[in-house]
């Protein structure tokens, strides 16, 4: 079945809402944090059964083991042992972010350009690029991308689009926007020829230009997408992100779920959830964990700091995650990081992922009580 979305409560204080997305492989309570499992695995997290929705990257799975190989093994759910919802992207994000830098990197660097060595050629047909793994020449078109996502079998899929960096000149911006929306229409047409249980979100572009964002909303709203995803360049700082999300959500109907692509750090979630965003994807908690950044209700702990060398408190007192429940202390976790023990990143990732789920539960409760 295609997804069903129900709004359970609309906040009286903001545009925030609590909802539920039903898919073939289970339900997602929203707003939800969606961790990124790049190669079909959450780095440092072995048990993802309590994660309501997981984001897998089509580009990396095309490169290895191959989308057809995954299909031959029963699809992504069976391949990775997950009986819960999965969302995949088109593959375009990785291709263009390898050339231009990711959205998060763009925000940090104000769009300083990276090399474009990975992209060989781009035109209206699609994009030719080199595999980061072995240098093979690969091709991705709307139809190729959607077929790959059909092979993978995710519950929610994304049409092919072109990710532009912040520094793009206006002339190419217009050309790219037209190409992106043509690609999205082709993606949707290919999907609808054999939708099965899968659903597709339309991606809204427009950079930081309100008029272009409104046009993007109109494009997605006029087509039978199952949900909306806010993508493209979101600016150079949190203020820009908030502005883009505000104007975009104000021009979307309330009936479809809304996803914010590539943004899922805590400051951004708190700043944008009030505009009616239903899901956020990011590798933020596991990446932070691998660098010794521990998320807690008292703020982030830089566990490598000397102050934790003799701290026998749990990572976070009162936390029910497996790491804290088993008595992993701050001093012990710091020791593991200092000696480069792989378990350090595992325990930290388990805690951070649990913390993110706890925060989303808190956010849903605040919305239900009209406090957010």
Curated annotation (Swiss-Prot):
SUPFAM superfamilies: tRNA-guanine transglycosylase. Its cofactor is Zn(2+). Residues 262-268, 286-290 are annotated as: RNA binding. It catalyses: 7-aminomethyl-7-carbaguanine + guanosine(34) in tRNA = 7-aminomethyl-7-carbaguanosine(34) in tRNA + guanine. Pathway: tRNA modification; tRNA-queuosine biosynthesis. GO terms for molecular function: metal ion binding; tRNA-guanosine(34) queuine transglycosylase activity. Binds 1 zinc ion per subunit. The keyword Ligase does not apply. The active site is at 89 (proton acceptor), 281 (nucleophile). Its EC number is 2.4.2.29. It comes from the Bacteria. InterPro entries: TGT, TGT-like_sf, tRNA_ribo_trans-like. Disulfide bonds: none annotated. GO terms for biological process: queuosine biosynthetic process; tRNA-guanine transglycosylation. It is an enzyme of class 2 (transferase). Substrate binds at residues 89-93, 161, 232. The keyword Transferase applies. Zn(2+) binds at residues 319, 321, 324, 351. Catalyzes the base-exchange of a guanine (G) residue with the queuine precursor 7-aminomethyl-7-deazaguanine (PreQ1) at position 34 (anticodon wobble position) in tRNAs with GU(N) anticodons (tRNA-Asp, -Asn, -His and -Tyr). Catalysis occurs through a double-displacement mechanism. The nucleophile active site attacks the C1' of nucleotide 34 to detach the guanine base from the RNA, forming a covalent enzyme-RNA intermediate. The proton acceptor active site deprotonates the incoming PreQ1, allowing a nucleophilic attack on the C1' of the ribose to form the product. Homodimer. Within each dimer, one monomer is responsible for RNA recognition and catalysis, while the other monomer binds to the replacement base PreQ1. Belongs to the queuine tRNA-ribosyltransferase family. This is Queuine tRNA-ribosyltransferase. It comes from Chlamydia muridarum (strain MoPn / Nigg). The gene is tgt.
